[in-house]
Amino acid sequence: MSSPTEVVSPAWQWLGIELVETGEGSAVVEMTPTADMANHAGFVHGGMISALADSAMGRSLRTIKPAVVRAMSFDLKLSFISAAKVGETLRATGGVVHAGRRTAVTECRVEAAGRLVATASGTFAITREKE
């Protein structure tokens, strides 16, 4: 896997998501949730974890050939395994399961300090670079 440097989306900047590494068909992203991302119980809100997983899966699609120039999720399923604490770094590892001409299926694991927080799967509409 490589350690890329590139411009990220405004949503990634707002959430504090950072691209850690990519490989063919995979991407790792991280974020460290802040207190304003907590739910009423004081744990990280599930929507923040969902956004992180969606970001990892979408970014993994940008690593395949022919190149994907746009990926938009139209189905996202999450299973929450354990609570995430504010201030602990969450690492999401996304991977491409299958990519056709117009749609792709992906999967993701979200972990905190080696502990599984959530698993996810997603289906994306993709636009590929013309060959």
Please report, for each region that a protein language model flagged, where it lies by residue.
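Terminal targeting signals and extreme-terminal segments of soluble enzymes
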Residues: 1-131
